[in-house]
Amino acid sequence: MHVNIMRLACFAAMSTATSGVCTAQRLTGAHSTGSVPAPVALDTRGLFQEKFARVGDDVFISGQPTEQGLRDLRAQGVTTVVNLRSPPEMARVPFDEAALVKQLGMEYVYLPMRGTPELPYSPAAVKSFAAAMSGAKGKVLLHCTIAWRASHLWAAYLIQNRDVPVATALEQARMINLMDDMRMDGDRQPVEAFLGRALAEVGHGKR
């Protein structure tokens, strides 16, 4: 299964590369390189709930993974799993994700959030995710239930930590599962809570 995942990602990269060569683009670790490419949607193959995408050479963003999905990604070099789901949500998952991740030799970063006072979307979450990205020794999986929260966190990370313009960050997150019509309350979006300010207030150079 992991061979098919790699082939799909490589094929997508080749379709846009003038050289026709699938080249690596690191986004994790202390020595990440280059600009952030657009996500590539991959077939979930029943291993991830609803959404599965790859960004660059070493970041995956998805809905809830199955046991086999985690095993396949480990075989692909994933060393860090970042989970945004709340404890009640994880209680409904038919296996112990934290235990499996550790059993497979990966680091488990648990950042539960629901947009509630108890589990808020906050700038601290972006900081924690950025630390996980820079500290990763290999590839990273970021997931929630259907990649909606993950898409908003990814957009905030791009804006806050990678100096990606707001419009570009939102467009790339839409390619995963941003869904602008789903909001926290009124007109507020999770990405704004992650940033700690409205998108219209984001500094010059990131609009």
Regions flagged by a language model, labelled:
Residues 2, 20-21:
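Coiled-coil-like amphipathic alpha-helices with heptad-repeat character
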Residues 18-19, 142:
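Helix-centric, low-specificity signal for extended rod-like, repetitive segments
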